Amino acid sequence: MLIYDGSKAYENLQTAIKKRTFRFPAKTEKDYRDGLLLPSLEPRFTLTSDQKIFTIGSCFARNIEAELTGRGFDVPVAKFVLPKDEFRHPGPHMLNEYNAGTILQRIESVFGEFRYSDEMGVEAVEGGYLDLFLHIHQQPVSLERLLERRREIAATYQELASSSALVITLGLVESWFDSLHGCYVNKAPSKSLIQKNPGRFHFHRMDVEDVLARMNACIEIINANMKTNIVLTVSPVPIEATFSGDNVILANSYSKSVLRVAASLLYEKFDNIDYFPSYEVALSKGTAGFAGDNIHIDKMLVKEIIAYMVQNYVTGRGTDENAPPPVSHYVDREIKNALSR
């Protein structure tokens, strides 16, 4: 629980009024533009285009890295390529890490604290093998190629250790755990694999403590091994299908709420973390900000979100001092009276 002395709470309110951030902006306010809410930010650090930026997390991380690459940043994951017969999407999409468990494993592997053994996360199917640590839409390959590809991925992730900044995107709380090998996977094991191995695979729906424990471990490992800044964000892309038994709309709301709380707690704990509100910006547009499937973010909205990120972290422009003043009713009379007493 966050507790302030009463006087401090009123100081916070006064400061927020001066910054025009203490309540939702009217449509004439600077934090509202063309149907989007763009909250004023005070970044803890800045980024420069000569820096190496490593991106890790859910599919929205792919949107971020594509836009950053187009703006001249060195983004190692964006360079990862795969043959089209293995994966019909751009190569970086194969590297999606959907939950805090797989993100932790991947970061641990960079610093020698986790090893992807040849037996882990391999499912035999018609036509070859699938890697449960990777994207759900992969094509079967030979076991030899699967293991070779893992080495290629490991080489890409070694770039993380020499990166100036990280962008970590939290995606889901629904995850699958392999109790035989003690690891989380990204691709759900098939029903037949589960039936052949009773008691091996378990569905986990993480809560705030679960996510926080794993992400705390991630940041502590990173900070113990390198000096870097971290932009933490929550993906606005909803869950496509839920194993929870809940309506997917409710399951998604739970998922994003848990991740958003965890992100705030991480921001409060670590000085080298900044929270970037891509989730809040995207949702302020409503379903108009999504493609026809109501899952993928509209490409133009992605560009607006990244432009907003660049404005705050790269150009250093931050808040606009020439923004229009608040509308006359922006500060309620009751609040004015309370502040004057």
Task: Spell out what each predicted region is.
Residues M1-R341:
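Extracellular glycan-modifying ectodomains
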